[in-house]
From Swiss-Prot:
GO terms for cellular component: centrosome. It comes from Homo sapiens. This is Ankyrin repeat domain-containing protein 26. Residues 586-602, 613-626, 661-673 have a biased composition (Basic and acidic residues). ANK repeats lie at residues 45-75, 79-108, 112-141, 145-174, 178-207.
Length: 1710
């Protein structure tokens, strides 16, 4: 049968702690559970820069990485971990705060689907968890196992974190994949404080896991029951007349946990059982066998039968009365679900005084508990049910089997085909049988063995260490109708374990096997299995009672072989036998009719109930052993009366059934019987007791025979018939012979039993010795394993240290490289700076040379100026001379004229000369002017050039000073940097030296570690050698266990294969899940980015729209401001033009807003009227006071101010009107909205109409009249629609006319403005008259148009009133139609409903049309108002006409005034012309000055730009020079470094050569030492041969050689230890040849010695070769240990080893 053991001390979380993950899929180690290893297994190659910095807690580095954007905030490593995950797992709250402030994603999951909050809670990092919770991390996310952060807090028993999680709305009822809430998890983990805390927080106490078990109830029940039961064994015996009352005893076992899958009957958590290892299976099977004891089913005989009916509620006593048949007592047991069958109840029985009646006391159900407080077993009450429950249970467990298989972690194939399934139930389950004698009513003594029917009863089997229970199929071949539940698989029933057996006074050995007749081969297999189980039990044998029962069972089998098939006999043989000696078996129809019903009832009732029954009292066992021997003795006696007894040579009995006459199966040989009995320590006493009881019981028939003879003698006194007397005497003699034969047979059996007891004692001693040796071996094995584990741990630690050292070395190297690179960069920067300095110096030189050139040019210009001034002076002198000459000539001419007045010819000549001279003078003056202009221009240019040059000089001097300052600063900075660099270089050199020293130290440590490793390997090799020796010593024991181990290995391999397949599938699914999760995360990130982008775009759009609006508002405001400023300027220049500009602004506003146009036009007309009034007043004033123009002007100014005030008033009125207009616009918008709503409703109604048209086709016949009326209404509706359309057309026409009128009004206004302008001019008299005429004509035309529009409006109003009347009529008709429709009844109801819908639709349409009409009416009203406004405008125009007539009159008066004013204006115009010329000259001068200044500014800017460029070039040159210098220095340093490296390499090479020389010298020394060792070994071998000769001459050596071969050579260990050699010592059995028969003769001794010498020589040569090879390879080896015990040889070896060790110490410092 399959035995599966669960681990003790596992986590109570089921699959929670046992679920394994692959290292590739998850973040942790392989085999890591849900709660094991809370941190991450970090590898540098998997991490990015930000991940390394976050895991190390380096906040500055994380900031730097994020600033440089080397990694993102949410970047993931190969395990999908972010920097936040690693910071939380390693407990760095500063890094967490930094990442959270940068707004990283908080709910990102790793490969195990764990968030950073989960890792913080799992690693007990409270600060990190609080930071995450405060920033909005989700506490209700679940990982791969379904665990939330609260689960991890509960598991760690961290109440503070749990309170914080609950504060941030963590789900207290969250379930993981095992359906465990945090409360259930705390209960299962025995975390009392956490449970109390969760209950305070109102956790659900009635929560149920997958198995529908409440840990709350279990824990409460456990707390109540723990103090009531103790762990001691209670063995009490209460014996009454014939039966004993067995009491309960409980022994808590160790590691006897048995998970069950029957979750409906037991409310316990199932555990996923891991793969069982062989060692654990062996130990667990031993311990479970110690803890489990079997119960049994008793066969009771007599006239009455007793059936057990156990009900915990009623506990009634049931007494069943029947024919004399066998009674069946069925006891079904469930195996304990969790690890300790503590209290197993057994019913107590009493035999009543009444001989035929037996009662059963009510028994209390026992409750079994586990010591660790988790697993509790309650025995449920038994209930009697129908026979169908067997099959029902079978089907239920077929369904539950898959769940149980998954819980066990086993495959179905291994479940079905198990090597342990061949074991029988009776083999594994010791049984006790009570077979009491029931007294008959007539007082006759009856033999129970003959009277007892061979029936089926249930033997409850609790297999030792087995989770699987089998029910044997044992069916009677003659009783087909008996219902027996067949089991399909060994693991189907975990709580129902009844087995059915047929008994004939002795329990059958092979009752649990499927085959009906057991064979000898099967018995042999069972015996082997029993021996293997005995060997597995070890040295501890705490409960011998189980084995005693097993012994008794086998003793019974040894004596009598039961026949399984004799379950029924014929009714014909039950009637007329009154002998009392030969009484046939009774198996009538009553037997088989009664039995199956009761048996099935018992079975069905015991199925769901989980009762644990156990019998442990030793006295009870002894008593049952006696009774079990009694019954076969009587059975044999009854069979011997039939004359069919056979006594074989092997002392085995064969029995022939009386009913069918066929022989039953023989028992096995005595050897097999002996093997069956070698399984207990204390079975000798029981066997002796059983033999005694057998001999005593054999005397019982003899006493009955004497009583019979007395009866014959009494009859003989009365009876005279001699023939009958003779017959009676013959019968009596035959009975006496049979009894004597029986006694002889019993004596033979007693002799055999004694022999067997002796053998058993010997075997028991051997077994005890082997068990002790085995326990010692196991202890040694455990110790060796511990040492190996410690060595491995130390090796791992050393490897980790080495790795850490390597990583430190690499980090230091990287730091050095970085510093070197920085140094190189700084050197390059210095070189660049030096180059820039050089370039700046060059620029300075060039600037100085340019300055010298400019100075020279300036000097040249000054020289030229002086020359030109001299030339100018000369020209002035010449001109003065010419003038003086002319004057003299004129004077002379005058004199000559006066003197020579008569000489006309001379005068002509002189005049001609004068003209010529004057022309020359004019030419000279022109030349002088041009020369002056040129000189002036040149002087200006020179002065400008001088100024520029001075400015340039100043700038250059400033730049030179700045450059010098910067140069000094840069030189000082670079000197400081150079000093820092030199210091850093020195530091780096010191660090290099330190690193070299540390490297040397590390190398020394590595060498020491190597030496330690070698020592550890040496120790391990020694341990392995000792192990091998021990294993050779116990090969026999292992050979016996090899079969079981092979089977176990096969099972384990199957399990491993299945687990590997499952793990691969899991890995695949996990990888798929991870990939899907990664894709999901990527898509989610992409979506987030897209949404963020959209939001940004929307924000940008909104911002741009807002900016646009602001810009428009600003633009409008600016436009308004500009317009205002323009108006003000015009008002300052001319008051009339101001009014016109304001009118223009008003017109522009009218153009912008069409709705405001009318109001603005009114204001314009009013302003015009006022203007005309002002003009009239001016004309009157001009008529009255034409002379006082100034006073009039003042009055006009005051009047203009009044006009402005009025204008402001009008503007206020205009604003109010604009508000009114806005309200009207809002009303229009509301009406438009209503119209749109009505249109939408119209569309909806049209859709509904389309749907209803299909339905209305059927109703067309019935509703013809209604349709006609509807058509009329529709016609009216269409007419109304047409009218509305006409109205809209009229409205459009009116709007067009209004637009035309507005255009004409605008034209008129333009003309009025032109008139006003013309008024100002003087020449406007005739033109104005013509324009006035035109205006009059236009006014008349406007009046005509207005009259026509008024007529049209009147007509439209009439049409509207007509439409309204029509609508009213249609409404009335529709109402009448509706009233008329109410009269229709019956069939028209449906049609009425549909028509109502249509009519309602039409009503809605009509309402919409009325609304449209109302809107049209409102529009008409609006048009009326507009017409009224136009009429008002016409009236105003009439007033304008009147004013124009008055103006014409005033014009005539003004014309005269204008004539007077013109003269005054002409004067003013002359003055104005002069002023304008003066203004123009000033403006030109200003422009010239501005242009000159701009030129100067441009030149200055250009000069500045050039100087900046020069500066930049200078800096670049300086920088390049510094860079070059730094590069040169770096090259020098590199060359120095290369020299140092080369020197180091040379030094290393020299050192290596020295070491090589030393090594060669050591090799030579070793060779010499090896040669010495070989010599000493040869001497030792010679001494060994002598010693062997001496020893083998003694007789003691021969005796030891005969018993067992020498397994190991003597004195080997001493040599091995003294030499400190590392070579394995392999023991060889062929060193000494064991001689079985030593001879005393000299020839045999000589032959033996010669053989021994040959073998020793071979071994010595072999060992010498191996030693030489090992010495050459450098490993330490030990030569073959000889058997010399003399002091001389030991001294030699000791000296040699000491010398060798000293040499090693000198050379290697060991």
């Amino acid at each position: 049968m399959k035995k599966i053991f669960s681990k003790k001390g596992e986590s109570p979380l089921g699959s929670f702690a046992r679920r394994q993950r692959s290292s590739a899929g998850g973040g942790g180690e392989p085999g890591e559970g849900a709660y094991s290893q809370p941190g991450y297994h970090v590898r540098d190659r998997d991490l990015g820069k930000i991940h390394k910095a976050a895991s190390a807690g380096n906040v500055a580095k994380v900031q730097q990485i994020l600033l440089l954007r080397k990694n993102g905030l949410n970047d993931r490593d190969k395990m999908n971990r972010t920097a936040l995950h690693l910071a939380c797992a390693n407990g760095h709250p500063e890094v967490v705060t930094l990442l959270v402030d940068r707004k990283c994603q908080l709910n990102v999951c790793d490969n195990e689907n764990r968030t950073a909050l989960m890792k913080a809670v799992q690693c007990q990092e409270e600060k990190c968890a609080t930071i995450l919770l405060e920033h909005g991390a989700d506490p209700n996310l679940a990982d791969v196992h379904g665990n939330t952060a609260l689960h991890y807090a509960v598991y760690n028993e961290d109440i503070s974190v749990a309170t914080k999680l609950l504060l941030y709305d963590a789900n207290i009822e969250a379930k993981n994949k095992d359906d465990l809430t945090p409360l259930l998890l705390a209960v299962s983990g025995k975390k009392q404080q956490m449970v109390e805390f969760l209950i305070k927080k109102k956790a659900n106490v009635n929560a149920v896991d997958k198995l529908e078990s409440s840990h709350q109830l279990i824990s409460e029940y456990k707390e109540e029951r723990i103090p009531k039961h103790s762990s001691q064994n209670s063995n009490s015996v209460d014996e009454s007349s014939e039966d004993s009352l067995s009491r309960l005893s409980g022994k808590p076992g160790v590691d006897d946990s048995w998970p069950t899958s029957d979750d409906e009957d037991l409310n316990f958590d199932t555990k996923n059982v891991p793969k069982p290892s062989l060692a654990k299976l062996m130990t667990a099977s031993q311990q479970s066998r110690k803890n489990l004891e079997a119960t049994y089913g008793t066969v009771r005989t007599g006239n009455r039968t007793l059936f057990e009916d156990r009900d915990s509620d009623s506990q009634d006593e049931v007494v069943v009365e029947s024919l004399p048949t066998t009674s069946i007592k069925v006891q079904c047991f469930s195996h304990p679900t969790y690890q300790s069958p503590d209290l197993l109840p057994k019913p107590s029985h009493k035999s009543l005084a009444n001989p035929g009646l037996m009662k059963e006391e009510p028994t209390k159900p026992g409750i079994a508990k586990k010591e660790n407080g988790i697993d509790i077993i309650e025995s449920a009450p038994l209930e009697q049910t129908n026979n169908d429950n067997l099959t029902y249970v079978d089907e239920v467990h077929k369904n539950n089997r898959s769940d149980m298989m998954s819980a066990l972690g086993l495959g179905q194939e291994e479940d079905i085909e198990s090597p342990w399934d061949s074991e029988s139930i009776s083999e594994n389950f010791p049984q006790k049988y009570v077979d009491p004698l029931a007294g008959a009513a007539d007082g006759k003594e009856k033999n129970i063995g003959n009277e007892q029917a061979e029936d089926v009863f249930y033997i409850p089997s609790c297999m030792s260490g087995s989770r699987n229970f089998k029910m044997a199929k044992l069916e009677d071949t003659r009783n087909v109708g008996m219902p027996v539940a067949h089991m399909e698989s060994p693991e189907r029933y975990l709580h129902l374990k009844p087995t059915i057996e047929m008994k004939d006074s002795v329990p059958n050995k092979a009752g649990g096997m499927k085959d009906v007749q057991t064979s000898k081969a099967a018995e042999h297999d069972l015996e082997v299995a029993s021996e293997e189980e005995q060997e597995r039990e070890g040295s501890e044998n705490n409960q011998p009672q189980v084995e005693e029962e097993r012994k008794k069972h086998r003793n019974n089998e040894m004596e009598v072989s039961a026949n399984i098939h004799d379950g029924a006999t014929d009714d014909a043989e039950d009637d007329d036998d009154d002998d009392g000696l030969i009484q046939k078996r009774k198996s009538g129809e009553t037997d088989h009719q009664q039995f199956p019903r009761k048996e099935n009832k018992e079975y069905a009732s015991s199925g769901p109930a989980l009762q644990m029954k156990e019998v442990k009292s030793t006295e009870k066992e002894k008593r049952t052993s006696k009774e079990s021997v009694n019954s076969p003795v009587f059975g044999k006696a009854s069979l011997l009366t039939g004359g069919l007894l056979q006594v074989d040579d092997d002392s085995s009995l064969s029995e022939i059934d009386e009913d069918e006459g066929r022989p039953t199966k023989k028992t096995s040989n005595e050897k097999n019987k002996v093997k069956n009995q070698i399984q207990s320590m204390d079975d000798v006493d029981d066997l002796t007791q059983s033999s005694e009881t057998a001999s005593e019981d054999c005397e019982l028939p003899h006493s009955s025979y004497k009583n019979f003879m007395l009866l014959i003698e009494q009859l003989g006194m009365e009876c005279k018939d001699s023939v009958s007397l003779l017959k009676i005497q013959d019968a009596a003699l035959s009975c006496e012979r049979l009894l004597e034969l029986k006694k002889n047979h019993c004596e033979l059996l007693t002799v055999k039993i004694k022999k067997m007891e002796d053998k058993v004692n010997v075997l028991q001693r051997e077994l005890s010795e082997t068990k002790e040796i085995k326990s010692q071996l196991e202890h040694q094995k455990v110790e060796w394993e511990r040492e190996l584990c410690s060595l491995r741990f130390s090796l791992n630690q050393e490897e980790e240290k080495r790795r850490n050292a390597d990583t430190l070395y690499e980090k230091i190297r990287e730091q050095l490289r970085r510093k070197e690179e920085q140094y190189r960069k700084e050197v390059e920067v210095k070189q660049q700076l030096e180059l820039s300095l050089q370039t700046l110096e060059m620029e300075l030189r060039t600037v100085k040379s340019n300055l010298n050139q400019v100075v020279q040019e300036r000097n040249d210009a000054q020289r030229q100026l002086s020359r030109e001034q001299n030339a100018r002076m000369l020209q002035d002198g010449i001109l003065t001379n010419h003038l003086s000459k002319q004057k003299e000539i004129e004077m002379a001419q005058k004199k000559m004229n006066s003197e020579n007045s008569h000489s006309h010819e001379e005068e002509k000549d002189l005049s001609h000369k004068n003209s010529m001279l004057q022309e020359e003078i004019a030419m000279l003056r022109l030349e002088i002017d041009t020369i002056k202009n040129q000189n002036q221009e040149k002087e200006k240019k020179c002065f400008e050039d001088l100024k520029i040059v001075k400015e340039k000089n100043e700038d250059l001097q400033k730049t030179i000073k700045q450059n010098e300052e910067t140069l000094t600063q840069t030189i000082s900075q670079y000197n400081g940097r150079l000093s820092v660099l030199t210091a850093e270089n020195a530091m780096l050199n010191s660090k290099l030296e330190n690193e070299k020293q540390s490297k040397e130290r590390l190398e020394a440590e590595v060498e020491s570690y190597h030496s330690r490793l070698a020592a550890a390997i040496h120790d391990r090799d020694q341990s392995e050698t000792s192990k091998r020796e021990l294993e050779l010593a116990f090969q026999r024991a292992r050979d016996e266990c090899s079969r079981l181990q092979d089977k176990m290995n096969f099972d384990v391999s199957n399990l491993k294969d299945n687990n590997e397949i499952l793990s691969q599938q899991l890995f695949k699914t996990e990888s798929k899940l991870n990939s899907l999760e990664i894709e999901f995360h990527h898509t989610r990130d992409a979506l987030r980015e897209k949404t963020l982008g959209l939001e940004r775009v929307q924000k940008d759009l909104s911002q741009t729209q807002c900016q646009m609006k602001e810009m428009e508002q600003k633009y409008q405001n600016e436009q308004v401001k500009v317009n205002k400023y323009i108006g003000k300027q015009e008002s300052v220049e001319e008051r009339l033009s101001q009014l016109q500009s304001e009118n223009m602004l008003l017109r522009q506003q009218l153009d912008d807003a069409h709705n405001k146009a009318d109001n603005k036009e009114k204001t314009v007309i009013n302003i015009q009227d006022q203007f005309h009034a002002i003009v009239q007043k001016l004309q009157a004033e001009s008529e009255k006071q034409s002379l006082l123009l100034e006073e009039r002007n003042k009055e006009l100014i005051s009047e203009c101010n009044h006009l402005k005030e009025r204008q402001y008033q009008y503007e206020n009125e205009k604003a109010e009107r604009e508000v009114v207009v806005r309200q009207l616009q809002q009303e229009l918008a509301d009406t438009l909205k209503k119209q749109s709503m009505s249109e939408a409703s119209l569309e909806v109604t049209s859709r509904y109409r389309i749907n209803l048209e299909d339905e209305t086709q059927d109703l067309k016949k019935k509703l013809g009249q209604i349709r006609n009326q509807l058509q009329e209404a529709q016609d009216r509706h269409t007419e109304a629609v047409r009218c509305a359309e006409k109205m809209q057309d009229h409205k459009q026409k009116l709007e067009k006319d209004n637009a035309k009128l507005k255009v004409t009004v605008k034209k008129q206004m333009d003309k009025i403005e032109e008139l006003q302008k013309n008024l100002l001019n003087a020449n406007l008299s005739e033109d104005e008259k013509e324009q006035l005429k035109k205006l009059m004509e236009l006014k008349q035309s406007l009046e005509c148009n207005l009259d026509q529009e008024m007529k049209k409006n009147v007509e439209l109003e009439r049409e509207i009133t007509g439409f309204k009347n029509l609508l009213k009529m249609t409404r009335k008709k529709l109402n009448e139609y509706e009233n008329g429709e109410f009269s229709f009844h019956g069939d028209l109801k449906t049609s009425q409903f549909e028509m109502d819908i249509q009519i309602n639709k039409l009503k809605h349409k009509i309402d919409d049309l009325t609304a449209e009409l109302e809107t049209a009416g409102s529009k008409c009203l609006h048009l009326d108002t507009k017409n009224q406004i136009l009429q008002e405008e016409l009236l105003s125009m009439k007033t304008v006409q009147k004013k124009c007539e008055k103006l014409q009159k005033n014009k005539k008066k003004l014309e005269q005034e204008v004539i007077n004013l013109r003269s005054h204006i002409e004067r003013n115009m002359v003055e104005l012309g002069q002023v304008k010329q003066y203004k123009q000259e000033i403006e030109e001068r200003a422009r010239q000055e501005i242009a000159e200044k701009l030129k100067e500014v441009n030149l200055f800017l250009q000069a500045q730009a050039a100087s900046q460029e020069n500066l930049e070039q200078f800096r670049e040159n300086n920088f390049a020079s510094m860079k070059s210098q730094m590069e040169l220095r770096i090259k020098d340093l590199e060359s120095e470094l290369s020299k140092i490296k080369t020197s180091q390499e040379d030094f290393n090479k020299t050192e290596l050569e020295k070491y090589k020389q030393l090594y060669l010298e050591e090799l030579k020394v070793r060779k010499s030492l090896s040669s010495k060792l070989t010599k000493t070994n040869e001497r030792l071998a010679e001494v060994n041969t002598k010693l062997l000769v001496e020893k083998q001459q003694s007789r003691s050596l021969f005796t030891t050689l005969t018993t067992r071969p020498v397994m190991e050579p003597p004195c080997v260990g001493n040599l091995n230890n003294s030499l400190d050699l590392n070579r394995k010592l392999i023991p060889r059995e062929n060193l000494v040849i064991s001689t079985s028969n030593p001879r005393a003769s000299n020839n045999s001794m000589e032959n033996y010695l010669s053989k021994m010498q040959q073998e020793l020589e071979k071994n010595i040569t072999r060992e010498l070769k191996e030693a030489a090879a090992e010495l050459e390879s450098g490993s330490i080896a030990s030569p073959l240990g000889s058997t010399d015990e003399s002091n001389l040889n030991q001294d030699l070896v000791w000296k040699a080893s000491r010398e060798y060790v000293q040499v090693l110490k000198k050379n290697y410092m060991i």
